[in-house]
Swiss-Prot record:
Organism: Caenorhabditis briggsae
FT transit peptide: 1-15
InterPro entries linked to this entry: GTPase_ArgK (IPR005129), P-loop_NTPase (IPR027417)
Protein keywords: ATP-binding, Chaperone, GTP-binding, Hydrolase, Mitochondrion, Nucleotide-binding, Transit peptide
Domain of life: Eukaryota
Homology family: Belongs to the SIMIBI class G3E GTPase family. ArgK/MeaB subfamily.
One Pfam assignment: MeaB
SUPFAM superfamilies: P-loop containing nucleoside triphosphate hydrolases
Protein name (record): Methylmalonic aciduria type A homolog, mitochondrial
PANTHER family: METHYLMALONIC ACIDURIA TYPE A PROTEIN, MITOCHONDRIAL, METHYLMALONYL-COA MUTASE
Stored CDD domains: MMAA-like
Length: 412
């Protein structure tokens, strides 16, 4: 019973080597598979793999699904409520909701493909990623930029913000709406906050699909605000047409605080807070980055990154940044880089999803949580604590430990 209780919870680190001598006849528990809601499901022994598949995938959803049809109709009419519900579907890990989200995405993509044939690049949404260190003023800058785009340029703006998730509680503050109150009340703007949920790269799972849904809802530009600056932050550039890096003039030598990777991926650098006593520092920071960029190869042959200064107190400076955004948009559109970049991004995100799915499948596979194939199971249980100990003592790398577990799983 003790072994059964330990196995049903399956914390790999709690089962020690004293169970290695137990015979196969000692193991006869009911296997379980955790559902997406976190509730453990007891499954009968027969047809385990088939039922396991149902936990992960739902093949019963079709084009005629009433939820899909309702959301698609309302989404095409520009409903913000439908857009919010659709993004919730594609972010969900529930098999039925995820299947509905995928079906909805396919219908939206079909519709957008027809629009592209008719209107060309004018039917495409402009994807702008904005990153910067905490406190640089990302939310304030986005609100000022959104006001310029909606009020003076007649654009519909979607803002997707990513907030960090607590590693201890799994919670997230999601406080960007409190910093964008004016934009959140703008009928031509939509703001969606999402937690990272442990995802690396400053973005969250489903954000690429959310961009597609915003395009289907008729928005002209989507602004993606990331968690903050870091070397893994460069993955946000894999879903954007343009990367904008915000810099603060108040932190001394900014060149020491910004990673080279994010600079190389940036198409526009903006020094914020260019007003009052900080104007002199803003000019100095601008000069430093102009000099630094001379030693970096531009990401695109048709565009050289610019370094600008801006202040939310000065609407003309915000308008100048907006002009540079669309100058970039026109340049890559006319050169053909836009279409090529979008195609490459779709391929990269396919492999990103493959990695996520493989991890989920590996953790919940019957070979891991079911004891009929007890040799593989026991080997994994016994290996994990030893591998963790070897990693802590520096005997092996985490990569080698992961490869060892996967090879054991597949019996290689």
């Amino acid at each position: 019973m003790v072994v059964r209780a330990l196995v049903r919870a399956h914390p790999l680190s709690r089962i020690s080597c004293r169970y290695s001598s137990l015979a196969a006849s000692s193991f006869n528990p009911k296997p379980y598979i955790p559902s997406v809601s976190g509730v453990q499901k007891s499954l009968p022994f027969d047809n385990l793999l088939e039922q396991y598949s149902r936990v992960h995938w739902d093949d019963t959803v079709t084009y005629d699904d009433p939820t899909v049809q309702r959301l698609f109709k309302n989404l095409m009419s520009g409903s913000r409520a439908a857009l919010a519900s659709a993004i919730t579907l594609v972010e969900s890990r529930h098999p039925t909701k995820r299947a509905q989200g995928n079906m909805l995405l396919k219908m939206v993509l079909d519709e957008e493909r027809e629009k592209y044939k008719k209107y060309g690049r004018d039917s495409m949404i402009f994807r702008v990623g904005i990153s910067g260190s905490p406190g640089v003023g990302k939310s304030s800058f986005i609100e000022a930029l959104g006001a310029e785009l909606t009020e003076n340029r007649g654009k519909k703006v979607a803002v997707l913000t990513i907030d960090p998730t607590s590693a201890m509680t799994g919670g997230s503050v999601l406080g960007d709406l409190t910093r964008m109150q004016e934009l959140s009340r703008n009928p031509r703007a939509y703001i969606r906050q999402s937690p990272t949920s442990g995802s690396l790269g400053g973005v969250t799972r489903g954000i690429h699909e959310a961009v597609i849904l915003c395009e289907g809802a008729g928005y002209d530009i989507v602004i993606i605000e990331t968690v903050g600056v870091g070397q893994s932050e460069t993955s946000v550039s894999d879903m954007c047409d343009m990367m904008c890096l915000l810099l603060s003039p108040a932190h001394g030598d900014e060149l020491q605080g910004v990673k080279r990777g994010i600079m190389e991926m940036s198409d526009l650098l903006v020094v914020t807070k260019d007003d009052g006593d900080l104007q002199a520092k803003a000019k100095m920071t601008q000069a430093e980055y102009i000099s630094a960029l001379k030693f970096m190869r531009p990401r695109l042959d048709v565009w050289s990154p610019k370094v600008m200064r801006s202040s939310i107190m000065n609407k003309e400076s915000v308008s100048a940044v907006c002009t540079s955004l669309y100058e970039f948009w026109d340049t890559i559109g006319e050169s053909g880089d836009l279409e090529r970049r979008r195609q490459d991004q779709m391929k990269k995100w396919m492999w990103n999803h493959v990695k996520d799915e493989i991890m989920a499948v590996f953790q919940k596979h019957p070979k891991i949580i079911h004891l009929k194939n007890h040799k593989i199971f026991i080997n994994l249980l016994l290996q994990a604590p030893k591998l963790e100990k070897d990693i802590s003592s520096g005997k092996i790398t985490p990569g080698l430990a992961a490869e060892t577990m996967i090879r054991t799983f597949f019996g290689v």
